[in-house]
From Swiss-Prot:
Pfam families: Utp25_C, UTP25_NTPase-like. Its main location: nucleus. The gene is UTP25. It comes from Scheffersomyces stipitis (strain ATCC 58785 / CBS 6054 / NBRC 10063 / NRRL Y-11545) (Yeast). DEAD-box RNA helicase-like protein required for pre-18S rRNA processing, specifically at sites A0, A1, and A2. Residues 93-110 have a biased composition (Basic and acidic residues). Residues 1-11, 24-33 have a biased composition (Basic residues). This is U3 small nucleolar RNA-associated protein 25. The keyword Iron-sulfur does not apply. The keyword rRNA processing applies. GO terms for biological process: maturation of SSU-rRNA from tricistronic rRNA transcript (SSU-rRNA, 5.8S rRNA, LSU-rRNA). One of its GO terms (cellular component) is nucleolus. Component of the ribosomal small subunit (SSU) processome composed of at least 40 protein subunits and snoRNA U3.
Length: 722
């Protein structure tokens, strides 16, 4: 009888034992990993294979059920695998306690679940890391084979690329930083978009292409197609032109930067949800199929029916860890909406831990009706921005709160994930579970940017980083480009935002290395549909340009121009000595201006920002409205989070254009409110905006592309609109 080898916990939490101490320490350095040429086992290792079946295959496959009685060793392993979640649990309990009013109908349920909630506060702490044997017999594999795996974009992008090709692309794209070339430009006049596709230096991955009209024309798993048809029957028959233009590069695993223009446009979400599920199911089924082939070969070898001259088949179809899709979202409510969509499109009959998920992520609360519609959409429901959730897909169920290392999809806020990746307690830091991400999705990027973009930068540093521990990974199944730290060259990045900003553009232009091409969408904004035309107020709007040599020096040049040219003449140019608001987009510029006004001028001013207390904000606004404060400093992030309607504004000075064009409209209407109350004259009030040529993208959203080009390139520096 073959002896059994006990499975080990994750290396990061492996208990010390005498047997471990005797084993030589493996070298996992970058040099050692790059010199690997073959890791598949030889036929001579048959006996060892029978004795110790690698657990990583089982983790990748998943199972539908689990025995109720588990050994103590199994339970210990499950608890160790939840360490990343426990780090987030500790932080949430200390800093982010939530209070929910008790409902009579829930009292009994709450008492029953009280103990469970204490143990599993957030994101799968102490959730068992079950090993699912999901032996799905799927007829879709036969269909895929008939259509030809060579035509499948997933196979072409991840599994059929040559190692020598990736090595060469790494040299050109990352090491030598050669320029990408534009290979295609499209204009969708009836959709209000244009697109630009760029190809990496050398050559892009070749993806077979044919004309597609409906969603069934794409290589999508039948179970996902059936669920999509049941949920969106009209879209199943024929996709809208915009959805088709977006889905085609998405299914080819190209990077995409897509501004959806308005919060009410949510159609793109069903597309990336479908794409993520399709990627998970196809990857899992490929692993199952290859594992079956390996097992058949080993069984034949054991029975003596195999060809002894043939080598064991080699299948490189995995990464270091199981999670393949990472989705970054700003709030728990946005996570709730996405999970509901994933459940609909997954085709799963059961959902595990759904009640717990509803309790922690769903809320009925809505912002006041007096707030703008986009504000109500952003902050509806549970707007807590601290979460990290694992989702595991099996043949019949979708499990919420699965441990990170047994999850297929990770949905997280940037701050929630970054607190795990860079936990202050070094012993609790975990980042191995994002080492094998193949599809990265950032949705509602503008909301995330308003929270703290540094957390996104933190996440990007750890995605596809070589893991510090290998968690019983079977190196004979890991793709060579993963072992050689080249995953970033194959990872697809999908970025969705309401409007484009330098930070968001940078994710695709500078932080993306996907050699499968990148497609950037851009809204067509002209003088007819720009935000300026929707103000409904014939107010003088003065745009003043200053010369700035580079984006890096722009903040310094802007500040000097402001204090030397604009500020000294501010009181003279304004028809009113009070009611002057200075709007500052950047918090750092705001602090600098505030310090200058306080130390170098005698202006009677007040200031409110996103960190001001409620009492201070209320007092400053009242004093400004009463004329006790002549000048008010006001930040963009404060406006985003509170949407104040400031009274008493007679003159508006914008230190820079707001990134959100809707804010420009709302700020200008502050003056309209004063005009309506007869606090100032429409002909005497005005708005003045400072800008440089580096503000062209933001300027275009306000005045339109034709005017923006003229404002940035005209010999004149002063422009007036009404």
């Amino acid at each position: 009888m073959a002896r059994q080898v006990k499975r080990r916990p994750h290396a990061s939490a492996r208990p010390e034992s005498s047997s471990d101490s005797k084993k030589p320490k493996l070298k996992h350095g970058r040099h050692q990993m790059r010199t690997v040429t073959r890791t598949a086992r030889r036929p001579g290792q048959q006996d060892f294979e029978e004795e110790s079946q690698d657990t990583y295959d089982n983790q990748q496959l998943g199972e539908d059920g689990q025995n109720d009685e588990e050994s103590e060793d199994e339970q210990e392993i499950e608890q160790e695998s939840g360490k990343a979640y426990e780090a987030l649990l500790t932080l949430l309990k200390s800093d982010h306690k939530e209070s929910k009013p008790a409902r009579k109908s829930d009292k009994v349920e709450e008492n029953q679940d009280e103990e469970e909630e204490d143990d599993e506060e957030i994101a799968g702490a102490n959730v068992q890391n079950e090993e699912d044997q999901d032996n799905e017999d799927d007829n879709e594999d036969d269909e895929d084979s008939a259509r030809g795996l060579a035509q499948d974009p997933l196979e072409a992008h991840f599994n059929r690329v040559e190692d020598s090709y990736i090595d060469n692309q790494e040299r050109l794209v990352i090491k030598e930083r050669e320029k990408w070339t534009t290979v295609e430009k499209k204009t969708y006049d009836n959709l209000g978009y244009s697109s630009l596709t760029q190809s990496p230096p050398g050559r892009a991955i070749s993806i077979p292409s044919k004309t597609k009209v409906k969603i069934s024309d794409f290589f999508i798993k039948k179970r996902v197609l059936d669920a999509f048809e049941a949920t969106y029957p009209s879209d199943f028959e024929k996709l809208s032109p915009l959805d088709l233009a977006l889905l085609e590069p998405m299914m080819k695993y190209q990077d995409i930067n897509f501004p959806y223009k308005t919060f009410s446009n949510t159609s793109y979400r069903k597309l990336y949800a479908l794409h993520a599920l399709n990627h998970i199911y196809k990857t899992r089924d490929r692993i199952i199929k290859n594992t079956t082939k390996l097992n058949n070969y080993r069984e034949a070898l054991k029975n003596g029916t195999a060809n002894l001259d043939s080598q064991e088949p080699e299948f490189r179809d995995q990464g270091f860890t199981r999670p393949k899709v990472l989705i970054l979202l700003p709030t728990r409510n946005s996570c709730y909406e996405l999970v509901e969509l994933l459940i609909k499109l997954s085709g799963c009959e059961q959902q595990e831990n759904k009640k717990k998920f509803m309790n922690q992520f769903y809320a009925k609360e809505l912002p006041p009706d007096t707030k703008p519609l986009d504000f109500r959409d952003s902050f509806k429901g549970n707007n807590n921005d601290f979460f990290c959730l694992g989702l595991k897909l099996t043949r019949k169920s979708l499990k919420l709160y699965s441990s990170f290392y047994s999850s297929d999809i990770i949905i997280a806020s940037p701050i929630g994930l970054s607190m795990i990746l860079e936990n202050p307690d070094k012993k609790k830091r975990q980042y191995d579970f994002v080492s094998s991400i193949e599809v990265l999705i950032v949705d509602r990027a503008n909301q995330i940017e308003m929270q703290n973009w540094e957390n996104v930068a933190t996440v990007m540093r750890y995605v596809n980083k070589i893991p510090k521990d290998f968690h019983d990974a079977d190196f004979s199944r890991i793709r060579m480009w993963s072992i050689n730290d080249q995953s970033k060259l194959l990872r697809q990045n999908l970025i969705f935002s309401e409007y484009l900003t330098p930070n968001i553009n940078n994710l695709i232009t500078s932080k993306s290395f996907n050699i499968g091409n990148k497609t950037k969408f851009k809204p067509i904004i002209n003088s007819n549909n720009c935000i300026m035309n929707s103000i409904g107020l014939k107010l003088k709007q003065i745009f003043q340009r200053f010369d700035s040599p580079s984006p890096v020096s722009d903040p310094e040049v802007r500040f000097k121009f402001f204090i030397n040219t604009v500020l000294p003449s501010l009181m003279k140019s304004s028809s009113y000595s009070d009611g002057i608001m200075i709007f500052v987009p950047s918090y750092f510029d705001y602090l600098r201006i505030k310090h200058h006004l306080k130390s170098s001028t005698k202006f009677n001013f007040g200031s409110i920002d996103e960190y001001s207390s409620q009492s201070k904000s209320t007092k400053a606004r009242q004093q400004f409205m009463a004329g006790k404060i002549n000048i008010m400093l006001y930040t963009e992030r404060l406006h985003y989070f509170r949407r104040f309607e400031i009274s008493g504004v007679k003159t508006m000075l914008m230190y820079g254009l707001p990134s959100n064009p809707v804010f420009y409209k709302e700020l200008v209407r502050f003056i309209g409110k004063s005009v309506f109350r007869e606090q100032c004259d429409l002909d005497l009030a005005f708005v003045k905006i400072l800008f440089s040529k580096w503000d062209a993208v933001t300027l275009e959203r306000v005045v339109g592309n034709e005017r923006a080009h003229a404002l940035c390139n005209s010999p004149n520096e002063l422009f007036e609109f009404r």
